Amino acid sequence: MRLIDSTAKISPLAVVEEGAQIGAHVEIGPFSVIGKNVKIGAKTIIHSHVVINGHTEIGEQNQIFQFASIGEINQDLKYQGEPTKVIIGNRNRIRESVTIHRGTVQGGGVTRIGNDNLFMINTHIAHDCSIGNRCIIANNGTLAGHVTLDDFVIVGGMSAIHQFVVIGSHVMLGGGSMVSQDVPPYVMAQGNHAQPFGVNLEGLKRRGFDKPAMHAIRNAYKLIYRSGKTIEEAIPEIEQFAVNEPAVQLFLDFFKRSTRGIIR
C-alpha cells in the first residue's frame, strides 16, 4: 500500500513503489524513482531523474535536484544487504548528481544529515557519515565513510576527506584540500595534505560572534598551533580561556572526540 498524501503532486512519469510514504505538498518530477521503504516529509521537492531507495527518511522542505542518488547500497565490501538507513533533516538543498549512501552495521547503521545544508553538484557522502546543520560542500567534494562534519562547516570544491575524520564546527576548508586528520573547530585549512592557516574570523563575524569570543578563540588557536606545546600541554590553558568564554569549550570537547590526531 502506498501512503501518499492527497496534496502531493507526482508526475505520471515517476515511479513510486508500494509502501513509500509521501507527505503533504511533496512534488516528484518525471522519471524519478522512489523505493518502497522511503519516507518523504511535507513540502519536499524532488526534481526529475532522482533515485531514492533503501530505508531512507527525508524531512520537510528539502529540494533534491536531477540525477541525485540517495539511499543506494554503499561501497563497503563488508555490506551484506542489511536494512541500514539514510536519515535527512529539513530544508536541505541537494544539487545535481549528489550521491548519499546508506550506512553499515559496523558503523552504526545510519548515514545522518541535519538541517539547512547545501550539497553542490557531484558531492559524494559515503556510508555512516554524520553531517550537522548549515554545512556547505562545494562541487565535487568527497566524504569517505564515517566522516563527521559538525555545524557550519564549509568544504571547498574538489576536496576529499579521509575515513573517520572529524571536522569541527565553523571550519573552512579551501578548494582542493586533501584531509586525512581531524580539523579543530574555527580553523581555516587548505592543501594536500591540509594544513591550518588561521582562524575563520570572517565566518565567525557573519554568525554573530563578538570580539571577546573571537579574541579568546584566536588565543586558543595560538596555543594549539604556535606555542610549540602538545595538545595535552595546551589544554589546561585552554580550559582557563573557556571559563570566561564558552565558545572556547568547543576546542576541549573536540579533543575528547578526536581519534586521528589533528592537522598540523
From Swiss-Prot:
Q: Which controlled-vocabulary keywords does the entry list?
A: Acyltransferase, Cytoplasm, Lipid A biosynthesis, Lipid biosynthesis, Lipid metabolism, Repeat, Transferase
Q: What is its main location?
A: cytoplasm
EC class (word): transferase
Please name the GO terms of the biological process aspect recorded for this protein, alphabetically.
Answer: lipid A biosynthetic process
| Localization, UniProt | Cytoplasm
Q: Which GO terms describe its cellular component?
A: cytoplasm; membrane
Give the catalytic activity: a (3R)-hydroxyacyl-[ACP] + UDP-N-acetyl-alpha-D-glucosamine = a UDP-3-O-[(3R)-3-hydroxyacyl]-N-acetyl-alpha-D-glucosamine + holo-[ACP]
Q: Which Pfam families match?
A: Acetyltransf_11, Hexapep
- Signal peptide residues on this chain, from the entry's feature table: none
Q: Does the record carry DNA repair as a key word?
A: no
Which PROSITE patterns would you find in this protein's record?
A: HEXAPEP_TRANSFERASES
* GO MF entries: acyl-[acyl-carrier-protein]-UDP-N-acetylglucosamine O-acyltransferase activity
User: Pathway it belongs to?
Assistant: Glycolipid biosynthesis; lipid IV(A) biosynthesis; lipid IV(A) from (3R)-3-hydroxytetradecanoyl-[acyl-carrier-protein] and UDP-N-acetyl-alpha-D-glucosamine: step 1/6
EC number annotated for this UniProt entry: 2.3.1.129
Annotated InterPro entries: Acetyltransf_C, Acetyltransf_C_sf, Hexapep, Hexapep_transf_CS, Lipid_A_LpxA, Trimer_LpxA-like_sf
* Role this protein plays: Involved in the biosynthesis of lipid A, a phosphorylated glycolipid that anchors the lipopolysaccharide to the outer membrane of the cell.
Q: How does it assemble?
A: Homotrimer.
Annotated family: Belongs to the transferase hexapeptide repeat family. LpxA subfamily.
Q: What is this protein called?
A: Acyl-[acyl-carrier-protein]--UDP-N-acetylglucosamine O-acyltransferase
Question: What gene is behind this protein?
Answer: lpxA
